[in-house]
Amino acid sequence: EKLRPETLKLINETINRLGYLPNQSARQLAGGATKSFGLVLPRLDHGFSLQIASGAHNEARKHGYDLLIANADNDDILQDHYLRYFMGTQMSGVMVQPMASPDWHPAMTKMPVPIVHLDIHCSEPGYYVAADNEAQGRIIAELAIARGAHHIVVVGRAAFMQLTLRVLGIHKALALHPDIKIEVIDAGEWNTAADGY
């Protein structure tokens, strides 16, 4: 940007000819942080996690950042390992989509790099981005009611906070319709196509 175009062209040709690769560790020592974000996902085989990865990648690229993605394989210990790894490499920030139980809370606090928790609700201080799962449940119930449903069945693991909040929204919507039955079947996994995801 500060060089004449012909000088920049000559530099780039020399870089390509010599196969020069900048030392990212040296850049970190000089500048303190990388132009990269880390993203820790619980699994790489779930559509929602893939949408998060795609959206994060697009936004990072749009703003001149790189995105490194780690698969925690539904393992809290591995998730914490990747969080610590990304912290140690001085990322500009880390996003994590934890496997959330109703009693979930952030494992790490007061970190030198901003952490954003995705698809999770928490009252503790921090950065969180999540859908309104209770409103989703209400909308689902309202649609079922509008279509004449007499019985609503929800299949999923009650241990997951998102499902708990959706069921709460369904119950609230059904409060005015006591004749409609709701049944929750605690089965399946959150990340398999066979379970409707």
For each of these PLM feature ranges, what is it?
Residues 145-150, 175:
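Secondary-structure boundary elements
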Residues 18, 63, 111, 177-178:
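Helix C-cap/helix->beta junction micro-motif
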Residues 32-146:
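Alpha-helical recognition/docking segments in bacterial nutrient-uptake
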Residues 35-36, 66, 151-152, 180-181:
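Charged active-site motifs of nucleotide-sugar-dependent glycosyltransferases
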Residues 116, 175-176:
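Venus flytrap/periplasmic-binding-protein-like
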Residues 1-34:
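N-terminal helix-turn-helix DNA-binding module of bacterial transcription factors
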Residues 6, 24, 42-51, 69-78, ...:
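Hinge/beta->alpha junction and helix N-cap segments in small-molecule ligand-binding domains
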Residues 15, 60, 171-174:
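Conserved hydrophobic residues forming the short capping helix/wall of the S-adenosyl-L-methionine
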